[in-house]
Amino acid sequence: MLELLYTALLYLIQPLIWIRLWVRGRKAPAYRKRWGERYGFYRHPLKPGGIMLHSVSVGETLAAIPLVRALRHRYPDLPITVTTMTPTGSERVQSAFGKDVQHVYLPYDLPDALNRFLNKVDPKLVLIMETELWPNLIAALHKRKIPLVIANARLSARSAAGYAKLGKFVRRLLRRITLIAAQNEEDGARFVALGAKNNQVTVTGSLKFDISVTPQLAAKAVTLRRQWAPHRPVWIATSTHEGEESVVIAAHQALLQQFPNLLLILVPRHPERFPDAINLVRQAGLSYITRSSGEVPSTSTQVVVGDTMGELMLLYGIADLAFVGGSLVERGGHNPLEAAAHAIPVLMGPHTFNFKDICARLEQASGLITVTDATTLAKEVSSLLTDADYRSFYGRHAVEVLYQNQGALQRLLQLLEPYLPPKTH
């Protein structure tokens, strides 16, 4: 009964979704494009019979990059289709893989749209990153006997409590999933408590630890640092949300009193916020350039606004330390491991529930510092910039946490082998 109500409601609210897409398109025009894909209509043919991977957010897409590369290496003859839901996620997929994978939007969870999509792609295996439990998608895959694996699965206590209210509906949903590869024991236990069978759930660890700085990226970062700031300190604030840029800018203004040549790289989380961030910097009276301009910072440049896509790992490589946003406001924080991979200290606000386990490990190992406002942010950045040994201590411990927790990718690949043809590499 709940399935029918859910589907009927989803059809009824489609006009509201169109309005929302159109409104969001004011700041991000890409939201007004490719609507047909959201209903299973595609301009170009898709190669069937391969692997499909869905990642809803930018963070999940980034975590999936090593997995997709490993699958391409092991199964070069299988087409890989990567689906997302947002233009930002789409841009990340295209910048990471180009034409090496097929990329389209995953249709909304409507039976007819999903059937059109699955008829086109006809995957041998479907991977969903983290926790995207779409009832009609899961039902369609189950009916077609297509294996479904939730990779890098996580389930917060808050989300588990919400799902628990749906009782048998969620239990039936979970039992249609082939395998749940949980990030940790807590996540796995929550899935079992909601109705998944013990033999459906295994703990692999988090794929987010399986990132690395390639020699090519490191060399590019060194070159850019020499061009931008050969003799001045640099800090970076990334994935910032509304309400955080003003805090970062206030901290930077205070820091400039002590470090007059300090350079800030400010990277908002969403492209539609780039103009707002630029306005805030301008209103603060700070000298700035944008990354998209291609300009090189002069000695008087105080801020570089990172308004390009797909360059976050490169920009981390330029910085002496990093603040990771979504954490001073209640967004749950963003991935601190991308900064840790560069062996630089990581600062975050108190709201890190999206990365609770990772942040706890970093903080326990002295790789993460928690700040609460502009004053504490400026104070901690000042301490790190003043003392090179202190800065090195936190950076070294941050990257050690990364290395010590790697291995989830290989464990997951082994679990996927029974559902795929024999690997060729």
From Swiss-Prot:
Catalysed reactions, as listed in the record: lipid IVA (E. coli) + CMP-3-deoxy-beta-D-manno-octulosonate = alpha-Kdo-(2->6)-lipid IVA (E. coli) + CMP + H(+); alpha-Kdo-(2->6)-lipid IVA (E. coli) + CMP-3-deoxy-beta-D-manno-octulosonate = alpha-Kdo-(2->4)-alpha-Kdo-(2->6)-lipid IVA (E. coli) + CMP + H(+)
Any one GO cellular component localisation term in the record: plasma membrane
Phenotype of null mutants: Cells lacking this gene display growth defects, absence of Kdo transferase activity, and accumulate massive amounts of lipid IV(A).
Segments crossing the lipid bilayer: 3-23
The keyword Zinc is assigned to this record: no
BP GO terms, sorted: Kdo2-lipid A biosynthetic process; lipid A biosynthetic process; lipopolysaccharide core region biosynthetic process
Keyword Transmembrane helix attributed: yes
Catalytic residues (UniProt): E60
Free-text comment on this protein's domains from its UniProt entry: The N-terminal half of KdtA is responsible for determining the number of Kdo residues that are transferred to lipid IVA.
Family: Belongs to the glycosyltransferase group 1 family. Glycosyltransferase 30 subfamily.
Name of this protein: 3-deoxy-D-manno-octulosonic acid transferase
Gene that produces this protein: waaA
